[in-house]
């Protein structure tokens, strides 16, 4: 496995590799758990590397991308502690509960949509290529961190508006 930090120019041109952590996953135990360090720790450490670089690159906008396998709240808590000008774009798979009991995604889409995006989703195993139309919302919210504090985050929701019959919405 490899977790790289890759810089890109605003024109989308890759500029090299800033940092990379490579490892081999350990086999799962009989109970199905994997021994050793949690892989989500690598996402936090990647953000820490960017925080170190932020001091050396004050004119550069740094954006950290993390997939849904990252421990998102742990990452946001640590980034908040570091207080560096690194933005993050985190793909979430969990509809988090907010203070007051409502859910993150429904709270975000209660506001007016910012607009729409239309694109062609490429074919994948068992799925044909198709056009997708999504509405996009954004809202800055205070997310409970599970430890009695809150983390400010700009939350973006993109919802497919008219999926074809039998298609799973994107």
Question: Model-predicted segments: where are they?
Answer:
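Short glycine-rich loop/turn motifs
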Residues: 1-3
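Single, function-defining residue in the core of a domain
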Residues: 5-170
């Amino acid at each position: 496995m490899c977790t790289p930090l890759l810089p890109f120019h605003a024109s989308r041109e890759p500029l090299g590799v800033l940092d990379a952590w490579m490892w081999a996953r350990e086999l799962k135990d009989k109970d199905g758990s994997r021994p050793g360090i949690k892989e989500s720790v690598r996402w936090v450490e990647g953000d820490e590397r960017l925080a170190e670089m932020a001091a050396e690159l004050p004119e550069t906008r740094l954006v950290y991308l993390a997939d849904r396998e990252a421990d998102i709240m742990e990452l946001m808590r640590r980034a908040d502690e570091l207080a560096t000008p690194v933005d993050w774009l985190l793909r979430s798979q969990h509809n988090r509960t907010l203070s007051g009991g409502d859910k993150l995604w429904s709270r975000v889409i209660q506001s007016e949509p910012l607009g729409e995006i239309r694109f062609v989703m490429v074919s994948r195993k068992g799925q044909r290529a198709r056009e997708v139309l999504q509405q996009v919302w954004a809202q800055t919210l205070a997310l409970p961190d599970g430890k009695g504090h809150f983390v400010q985050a700009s939350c973006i929701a993109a919802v497919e508006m008219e999926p074809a019959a039998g298609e799973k919405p994107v």
